[in-house]
A protein has these predicted regions:
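N-terminal polybasic/positive-inside topogenic patches
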Residues: 7-18, 22
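Short, basic/aromatic-enriched C-terminal tail that caps enzymatic domains
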Residues: 306-322
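Rossmann-fold NAD(P) dinucleotide-binding segment
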Residues: 91-151
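Rossmann-fold dinucleotide-binding core
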Residues: 110, 133-213
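NAD(P)+-binding Rossmann beta1-loop-alpha1 motif at the extreme N-terminus of oxidoreductases
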Residues: 23-96
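Helical "substrate-binding/catalytic lid" subdomain
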Residues: 204-309
């Protein structure tokens, strides 16, 4: 019997060629994988699948709006070619025959992506919304997807996608979460069901980000100021004495790197976190301030300095942060 991974990655074949009954053939026809978006997360997942399942596990296609931008199209086509992915010109082309669809765009484009692709989803296809969005945003996307006859699943990616790639921990929720978990496990992914309601997985992700991304923003505000004041060594020594379980210098350098490389994407996520807090009837002051810091540093587009806190802080402080 074929593994779930093989089933999810099988190439479509016409019933006339295979001689299989129509119902079985339809299942085979809808067994390809598609991604909406082909950035860091999608490429990490696909490279992991390719490594685990062999050089040619089957058909994977993608639609990414960068294909419509002449300045970004070439890099997208090269990335797809490197990983054996069909780069579609339209959502309809990407989703033809796709029984499993991963939405992997930025948080601020997730609802737009669902709106654009919903009509092209196959009936009963799994739409795995892996974007870092508020429960309300995911619920709105779910209505669009399910109105088109597909199956919406809330997926939260709970760690950076590197180095784990497709083995990054995932939380899933929704009425078809168990079905989605089986598909994900079959692809060698680390998925766990956390509930049968849309929004449960994303709530965990969103509220965790208050702490994780907020800590990054606090790091920037504290240590950039300390570096400019010339007292960063004393501040770090005090932090180390207060909480020796953290290597504060190393963690601060890492936190700045995360913001420098991913700040724009993290800012979009933190706007969704702020929306989540408001939906819960709570103030969003910390989340909104975190979004501001993430965006300020991410928009600097600094070439990553050496792996040292001082070099990274200096590279940021050379720019205008006001």
């Amino acid at each position: 019997m074929a593994s779930a991974a093989e089933a999810a990655l099988a190439s479509p074949t016409s019933g006339r060629e295979s001689g299989l009954p129509d119902s079985i053939e339809e299942e085979k026809r809808m067994s390809a994988i598609a991604t909406i978006g082909f950035g860091e997360a999608a490429q990490a997942f696909v490279s992991g699948w390719r490594t685990e399942n062999g050089a040619s596990p089957g058909k994977i296609s993608t639609f990414d709006i960068k294909v419509e931008d002449p300045s970004q199209r070439g890099d997208l086509l090269q990335a797809c070619s490197d990983l054996g992915v069909d780069c579609a010109e339209t959502p309809a082309q990407a989703l033809t025959g796709a029984g499993t669809v991963f939405s992997l765009v930025t948080a601020d484009r997730a609802l737009e992506a669902a709106t654009r692709v919903a009509e092209f989803l196959g009936r009963d296809a799994l739409y795995l919304d892996c974007n870092s969005c508020s429960p309300a945003t995911k619920a709105a996307a779910a209505r669009l997807v399910e109105a088109a006859g597909a199956v919406y699943v809330d997926v939260a990616v709970m760690s950076p996608v590197h180095p784990a790639r497709h083995r990054s921990p995932l939380l899933v929720s929704g009425s078809s979460a168990e079905r989605a978990q089986d598909v994900l496990l079959g692809l060698g992914m680390q998925a766990r069901t956390v509930g049968d309601e849309i929004g449960q997985a994303s709530s965990i992700k969103m509220l965790r980000s208050v702490m994780i991304k907020g800590f990054e923003a606090l790091t920037a505000e504290c240590l950039l100021a300390a570096r400019r004041a010339g007292v960063e060594k004393a501040v770090l020594a005090s932090l180390q004495a207060s909480d020796p379980g953290i290597d504060w210098t190393m963690r601060a350098a890492y936190n700045l790197e995360r913001m420098m490389v991913h700040g724009k994407r993290r800012a979009a996520e933190m706007q969704e976190v702020a929306a989540t807090l408001r939906e819960l009837g709570l103030p969003d002051r910390m989340a909104s301030a975190t979004a501001d810091w993430q965006l300020r540093i991410g928009e600097l587009d600094i070439l990553m300095p050496e792996n040292s806190l001082e070099a990274r802080a200096d590279a940021i402080l050379e720019r205008d942060l006001t």
